[in-house]
């Protein structure tokens, strides 16, 4: 449903942000 879709998008955005920060730190 809509709530699960929102949670999935939020989780994906959180992982993407974490990956971006990790990538910047590793450089």
Curated annotation (Swiss-Prot):
Pfam families, sorted: DD_K
UniProt GO BP:
defense response to bacterium; defense response to fungus; killing of cells of another organism
Write down the InterPro entries for this protein, in alphabetical order: Dermaseptin_dom
On whether NADP is a keyword of this UniProt record, the answer is: no
Q: Which cysteines are joined by disulfide bonds?
A: none
Q: What keywords are annotated for this sequence in UniProt? A: Antibiotic, Antimicrobial, Cytolysis, Fungicide, Hemolysis
Function text: Has antimicrobial activity against the Gram-positive bacterium M.luteus and the yeast C.albicans. Has hemolytic activity on human and duck erythrocytes.
Q: What protein is this chain from?
A: Dermaseptin-like peptide
Q: Which organism is it from?
A: Schistosoma mansoni (Blood fluke)
